[in-house]
From Swiss-Prot:
E.C. numbers: 3.2.2.23, 4.2.99.18
PANTHER family the record matches: FORMAMIDOPYRIMIDINE-DNA GLYCOSYLASE (PTHR22993:SF9)
The species this protein was found in: Latilactobacillus sakei subsp. sakei (strain 23K) (Lactobacillus sakei subsp. sakei)
Protein name stated in the entry: Formamidopyrimidine-DNA glycosylase
Cofactor: Zn(2+)
Subunit structure: Monomer.
């Protein structure tokens, strides 16, 4: 599933390629992707101009004029491309936005799990999943004191808590494993067992790692491509994710993979020592 760095790179691509274009028609080829009735979605957007592309967590917010927004969640395999209408159409293309300039914005999804919902701008908190999102992982919105207080309320393992988008938004399996390794924290450590110093370091690593991943185009492990059709490069910088059996960069101990809250989890058993609950 694309995580925050990947979605941010899709956003940047669409901002460059699609903003300013006006919709002339919409071809919906797989209706389940559209939350609204097809006719409502189409009627609302034909004739509208894309004015901005924003992001909240892993959600894209495609702005049309001043009053309408398409909330788009890529889920597992969703991606966008902006191409000439003459370009061959992939069998995995499920929604096509035709523009008045002859180009098209296409939504592709091999798994068909992605979703789009047309709403009035300003009503984002009515969308399931958006209304309960935690802070964006930036120094001004993701505060150390608040993060520490949130973790102190939970005795569950730190990994699934970080995956909960209510604590901090945008993290998924890859970046949770990476930031826990950078912070020397075992993924099964009870959240309320972390000291303030450990929590502060984890906070800083989350912000720094996501920013670094964004600047390297995100991580392409399987099929991720940004809106310009390019893969990310951050997979070359991963420390533990997908590296079972590979020597740890810090200590040489083989990286292990376990299940934590039903999620495959990579860590170093020497650098990330498991602690018991208080």
């Amino acid at each position: 599933m694309p995580e925050l760095p990947e979605v941010e790179n899709v956003r940047r691509g669409l901002e460059t390629l699609a903003v300013g274009k006006t919709v002339s028609a919409i071809d919906i080829r797989w209706s389940k992707i559209i939350v609204n009735p097809d006719e409502v979605f189409t009627a609302g957007l034909v004739g509208q101009q894309i004015t901005a592309v924003d992001r909240r967590g892993k959600y894209l917010l495609i702005r049309f004029g001043e009053q309408l927004t398409v909330v788009s969640h890529l889920r597992m395999e969703g991606k966008y491309e902006v191409v000439a209408k003459e370009a061959p159409i992939s069998k995995h293309t499920h929604v096509i936005f035709e523009f008045t300039d002859g180009q098209q914005m296409r939504y592709l999804d091999t798994r068909k799990f992605g979703r789009m919902q047309l709403i009035e701008t300003g009503q984002e908190n009515t969308v399931a999943g958006l209304k309960d999102l935690g802070p964006e992982p930036t120094p001004t919105t993701f505060l150390k004191a608040d993060f520490y207080q949130r973790l102190q309320k939970h005795h569950k393992a730190i990994k699934p808590l970080l995956l909960d988008q209510k604590v901090v938004t945008g993290l998924g399996n890859i970046y949770v494993d990476e930031t826990l390794w950078l912070s020397h924290i075992h993924p099964e450590t009870p959240a309320n067992d972390l000291t303030r110093a450990e929590t502060d370091r984890l906070h800083d690593e989350i912000i720094a790692e996501l920013e670094l991943a964004i600047n390297h185009g995100g991580t392409t492990v399987n099929t991720f491509l940004n809106a310009t059709g390019h893969a990310g490069a951050f997979q070359e910088m991963l420390h533990v994710y997908g590296k079972k059996g590979v020597p740890c960069e810090r200590c040489g101990t083989p990286i292990e993979k376990i299940k934590v809250a039903q999620r495959g989890t990579h860590f170093c058993p020497k650098c990330q020592i498991k602690r018991n609950a208080k």
